[in-house]
Amino acid sequence: MAQILAPSIQCQTRITKTSPLATPISSKMWSSLVMKQNKKVARSAKFRVMAINSGTINRVEDLLNLDITPFTDSIIAEYIWIGGTGIDVRSKSRTISKPVEHPSELPKWNYDGSSTGQAPGEDSEVILYPQAIFKDPFRGGNNILVICDAYTPQGEPIPTNKRHKAAEIFSNPKVEAEIPWYGIEQEYTLLQTDVKWPLGWPVGGYPGPQGPYYCAAGADKSFGRDISDAHYKACLYAGINISGTNGEVMPGQWEYQVGPSVGIEAGDHIWASRYILERITEQAGVVLTLDPKPIEGDWNGAGCHTNYSTKSMREDGGFEVIKKAILNLSLRHKVHIEAYGEGNERRLTGKHETASINTFSWGVANRGCSIRVGRDTEKNGKGYLEDRRPASNMDPYVVTALLAESTLLWEPTLEAEALAAQKIALKV
């Protein structure tokens, strides 16, 4: 992100009642996605034309786009949680008797954890606690998406529930006083369904070298714009604090930015945005991957750069606070790397706008460093830092909480601090 501005004033865990005229993302948008993708989608389009002749698709689409708001007080709540891999999103729907404005108004629910790799078959019940709600861009009306975290029946967070610990860190008085802001740059790659090869690439072959694809326009340079744009609009509709999107360096790869968000909201909004993206690619007949290095060779990987600032960093003299934070991050480099995403060693090679995974570095305007500081921050003497190490498949609850913990709660010894400052050429 070019800069971190003030967070939106909208309450990120509340939702207002929508107008009865509110509608979900139109069927025309989904149709355009379906008609423009890979061979499988072409076959689907052929079936679609045949089905339209019999009226089947028209009747189904009428029901899919039906706004139930004028006809019932009940709403549909889509409960969303993180599955057993720590990166997959799962969901199921239930009827709620009336519109809600806050997750505390929603009931807890349960699911079969043995089917998601999160519980044994003989004791498979996992409990969902609603934590944040968003408007549903697929169903429209007063219907909602519900971000949940997962617990045992005894109330203990299950191992894949990283939100629980993050919430504890963000509720620490020292952290709350600093009002941590996050701007997260989520990169992702679109794959052709049948062959698991990037969208726009010749099957079994490669496009021309990187260079013409970043932020490009044109049928020979930009692949998947409809999906990116549909996702952008769906996130805005949902109330996600999405701030931008762009085509990436590798063809078939895209990025969107979420933030600035305060504390735990950053993780909630990233997970909600990922779920929406999964649903859109599902309807478009395209596969979404968050693999940090989907294609080996001279191609950029996919990251999740995390921009971070505290109240002290944003005030006059904040650059000195930023440098102290960088010092702490250098001393905990291995801790962060271990928590920054699976397969990240394939991406952090020191090439393709990355630093080496084994070496901590920082610099002003240097995209080959672990931590980048912008020119404006250096010039103004205050601002934010960008952690370029997180992989595209990182857990935002883990990354955001760890940044706060390392820079606001963890204190190194003076000796370790002095040695680290000398090692990374940092005057504090």
UniProtKB/Swiss-Prot annotation:
Q: Which family does it belong to?
A: Belongs to the glutamine synthetase family.
Q: Which PANTHER family match?
A: GLUTAMINE SYNTHETASE, GLUTAMINE SYNTHETASE, CHLOROPLASTIC_MITOCHONDRIAL
Q: What PROSITE patterns does the record point to?
A: GLNA_1, GLNA_ATP, GS_BETA_GRASP, GS_CATALYTIC
Reaction catalyzed:
L-glutamate + NH4(+) + ATP = L-glutamine + ADP + phosphate + H(+)
Residues covered by the GS beta-grasp domain: 75-155
Q: How does it assemble?
A: Homooctamer.
Could you cite one Gene Ontology molecular function of this protein?
glutamine synthetase activity
**Cellular compartments annotated:** Plastid, Chloroplast
The UniProt entry, under SUPFAM superfamilies, shows:
Glutamine synthetase, N-terminal domain, Glutamine synthetase/guanido kinase
Segments forming domain GS catalytic: 159-428
Keyword field contains ATP-binding? yes
* More details: Irreversibly inhibited by the herbicide L-phosphinothricin (PPT).
Q: Kindly state which keywords UniProt assigns to this record, in alphabetical order.
A: ATP-binding, Chloroplast, Ligase, Nitrogen fixation, Nucleotide-binding, Plastid, Transit peptide
Gene name, per UniProt, is: GS2
* Task performed by this protein: The light-modulated chloroplast enzyme, encoded by a nuclear gene and expressed primarily in leaves, is responsible for the reassimilation of the ammonia generated by photorespiration.
Top-rank taxon of the source lineage equals Eukaryota
Record's protein name: Glutamine synthetase leaf isozyme, chloroplastic
Q: Which GO terms describe its cellular component?
A: chloroplast
What EC number(s) would the UniProt record show? 6.3.1.2
One GO BP annotation here?
A: glutamine biosynthetic process
The transit peptide segment here is 1-49
Provide the primary localization.
plastid
Per the UniProt record, the source organism is Medicago sativa (Alfalfa)
Keyword Chloroplast among record annotations = yes
